């Protein structure tokens, strides 16, 4: 965290006049809000959690109470400011003694980082948009080609699909009584 948090001045009013200065209480609340937001988002990084373990913070009851206090960040009016939602997962896990004790193991930290990077590599915000074309049947069969078949042109795809079905039904499965 920064020693002296940088607080932006109030935005100008709609008539382009300068907004009144913040009261000392409002300024203090803003500093506290930014500091707690920055801290809770630091919890999203496993190496930071490892550092907290090394420095002994995770064994102090006052620090554990502070972590419980930070649970208010799950409320809708606060959660919208969180950029790294993984921090809330780790905030929950930090409430358990087993997780706190495992943070001393660098292999465990490496595994947390691997799982996290794997999650972010495959994570999507929403479902992919479905095209109208994907709802229709494809022009070319998606069935695997036999060794002696060549890829067909799209206009001949439906015709070849029928041939494949006939060929498969003729070949059938080789039973115990049939010769190879």
UniProtKB/Swiss-Prot annotation:
| Keyword Electron transport listed | no
Q: Name one GO biological process term.
A: regulation of transcription by RNA polymerase II
User: Could you confirm whether the keyword Ubl conjugation appears in this record?
Assistant: no
Cite the entry's keywords alphabetically.
Activator, Nucleus, Transcription, Transcription regulation
Instruction: Give the matching Pfam families.
Output: Med31
InterPro entries, alphabetized = Med31_sf, Mediator_Med31
Disordered: where is this region?
A: 1-24, 123-180
This protein's superkingdom?
Eukaryota
* Localization, UniProt: Nucleus
GO CC list: core mediator complex; mediator complex
Which GO MF terms are attached to this record? transcription coregulator activity
Its main localization is nucleus
Entry function? Component of the Mediator complex, a coactivator involved in the regulated transcription of nearly all RNA polymerase II-dependent genes. Mediator functions as a bridge to convey information from gene-specific regulatory proteins to the basal RNA polymerase II transcription machinery. Mediator is recruited to promoters by direct interactions with regulatory proteins and serves as a scaffold for the assembly of a functional preinitiation complex with RNA polymerase II and the general transcription factors.
Q: Which family does it belong to?
A: Belongs to the Mediator complex subunit 31 family.
User: What name is this protein filed under?
Assistant: Mediator of RNA polymerase II transcription subunit 31
Species per Swiss-Prot/TrEMBL record = Cryptococcus neoformans var. neoformans serotype D (strain JEC21 / ATCC MYA-565) (Filobasidiella neoformans)
